[in-house]
């Protein structure tokens, strides 16, 4: 499936501007009608769990700056719906609640996106200053001032203006981020170009990142989280799970010979035949074929690099081979 040429481009701005139509909903505690509640993710990565407890299964990550809807509450946990949409529970310290007007103002505000793998927000324009927050690739914050000082209400030295950018966290706290770690979001979104080279280069930034079920950030990723993160940073918004990702784009039209045993000498030749149909940048899906008694099941996804190699998240993000007999097969 060659997503680069087959699926329509959905700019990452959808993650920010995704909104929920104003309506009335039931208050999760009182059961009475109330206005819908919204929030913006305030942690660099907020862990989304199946149930309101730390022992519950991790199902997704929500990155800083993502707009969510609050649909439930239990103790210090909030049940949210993310733009995907994905419903899960998060720690309420990682959210900044907003009403409709506040949300409109937030969405309209100019923003930066973190394009470095990792960064920090400092209390002063100095790398040795107190750290207000960490940041990861894909995090979004509002612009306080730009490198030319525009928007700043405090006096900055020329050196600091050149080295740091002023940001406003979702909580409203103001801080400073090294200039090279951020880009103006609107300009970044307009320049995304999901070429094969860009996809592969972004994927390789994740090499060595640990596997985590439900992970979708450079801190830790599962297989579909890797694919989703890579395409997001190149301007394409993929579905969250591998089984959903397998339904977008076009299937590769080839006819593998499944009668050949994987332990036979002929299997290597068969695999090379299958590989000949692939192009770098294709998504590869692994799982079980449909039978008379069961449906097809997709359980893993990887990104094809070319030459029989692919990159995927399995224990860690690593490069493996499709060719039987290779050390990394």
Mark where each language-model region is.
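Second-shell loop/turn segments in exported
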Residues: 128, 185-190, 210-218, 291
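Bacterial N-terminal signal peptides
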Residues: 8-18
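Bacterial N-terminal signal peptides that target proteins for export
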Residues: 1-9
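...with weaker cross-activation on analogous glycine-rich loops/strands in unrelated enzymes
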Residues: 239-319
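Active-site nucleophilic cysteine motif
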Residues: 203, 215-234, 238-241
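Boundary regions of SH3-family modules and the immediately adjacent low-complexity/disordered segments
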Residues: 24-36, 66-67, 82-113, 117, ...
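Aromatic- and glycine-rich peptidoglycan recognition patches
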Residues: 97, 119, 126-132, 295-329
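Beta-loop motif signature
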Residues: 31-34, 40-70, 114-155, 211
């Amino acid at each position: 499936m060659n997503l680069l040429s087959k699926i329509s481009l959905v700019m990452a701005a959808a993650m920010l501007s995704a909104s929920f139509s104003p309506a009335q909903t039931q208050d999760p505690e009182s059961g009475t009608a109330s206005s819908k509640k919204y929030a913006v993710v305030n942690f660099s990565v907020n862990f989304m769990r199946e149930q309101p407890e730390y022992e519950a299964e991790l199902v997704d990550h929500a990155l800083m700056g993502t707009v969510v809807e609050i649909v439930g509450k239990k103790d210090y946990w909030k049940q949210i719906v993310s733009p995907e949409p994905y419903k899960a529970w998060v720690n309420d310290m990682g959210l900044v609640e907003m009403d409709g007007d506040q949300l409109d103002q937030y969405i309209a505000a100019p923003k930066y996106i973190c394009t470095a793998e990792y960064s920090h927000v400092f209390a002063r324009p100095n790398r040795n200053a107190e750290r207000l927050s960490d940041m990861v690739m894909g995090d979004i914050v509002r612009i306080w001032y730009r490198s030319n000082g525009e928007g700043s209400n405090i006096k900055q030295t020329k050196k600091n203006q050149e080295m740091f950018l002023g940001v406003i966290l979702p909580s409203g706290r103001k801080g400073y981020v090294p200039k090279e770690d951020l880009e103006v979001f609107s300009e970044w979104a307009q320049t995304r170009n999901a070429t094969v080279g860009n996809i592969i280069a972004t994927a390789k930034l994740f090499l060595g990142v640990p596997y985590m079920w439900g992970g979708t950030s450079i801190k830790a990723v599962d297989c579909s989280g890797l694919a989703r993160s890579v395409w997001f940073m190149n301007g394409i918004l993929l579905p969250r799970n591998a089984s959903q990702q397998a339904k977008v784009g076009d299937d590769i039209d080839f006819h593998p010979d499944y009668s050949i045993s994987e332990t036979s000498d002929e299997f290597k030749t068969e695999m090379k035949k299958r590989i000949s149909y692939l192009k770098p940048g294709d998504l590869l899906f692994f799982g079980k074929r449909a039978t008379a008694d069961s449906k097809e099941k997709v359980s893993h996804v990887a990104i094809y690099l070319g030459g029989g190699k692919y990159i995927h998240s399995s224990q860690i993000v690593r490069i493996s081979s499709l060719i039987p007999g290779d050390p990394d097969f």
